[in-house]
């Protein structure tokens, strides 16, 4: 099972599209946790429309703002039970086959533990703008150690 965490803070204009795009996924085995970090823009009203949806495992409203997206992620991790976690940011949306394609790659190689994808920037009408770097690249496997050393660790010189 995949646990989908949707952390939200004041993204009411995009939130319905995000939640709908998650719930429309063709992959059959997932749960959704909706987290709201004290939004003041009507996000709660959008979220409440989904309260009784069978895929929604839990909805959590913070009493005060956590101050960090990472705090929301940690809260979501504690509430989920899936083998994999998808952090589906509230101002994005996904193609209906997104999760199915990611899981096919992860399932094809038991050594894979992380899927990373490219994204496309769109305007408020859904029209793409800007470039998608490396669009059309084939799926590839990376050695995690080399990735960490090259991209995440920096020497303090």
Region spans (language model):
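Nucleotide-sugar donor-binding/catalytic module of glycosyltransferases
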Residues: 1-157
């Amino acid at each position: 099972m995949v646990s989908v965490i949707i952390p939200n803070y004041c993204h009411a204009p995009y939130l319905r599209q995000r939640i709908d795009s998650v719930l429309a996924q063709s992959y059959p085995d997932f749960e959704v946790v909706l987290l709201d970090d004290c939004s003041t823009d009507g996000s709660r009203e959008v979220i409440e429309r989904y309260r009784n949806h069978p895929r929604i495992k839990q909805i959590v409203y913070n009493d005060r703002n956590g101050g960090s997206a990472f705090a929301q992620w940690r809260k979501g991790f504690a509430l989920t039970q899936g083998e994999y976690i998808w952090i589906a940011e509230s101002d994005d949306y996904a193609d209906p086959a997104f999760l199915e394609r990611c899981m096919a790659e992860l399932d094809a190689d038991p050594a894979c533990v992380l899927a990373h994808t490219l994204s496309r920037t769109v305007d408020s009408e859904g029209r793409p703008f800007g470039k998608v770097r490396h669009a059309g690249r084939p799926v590839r496997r990376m050695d995690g150690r080399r990735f960490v050393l090259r991209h995440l660790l920096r020497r303090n010189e």
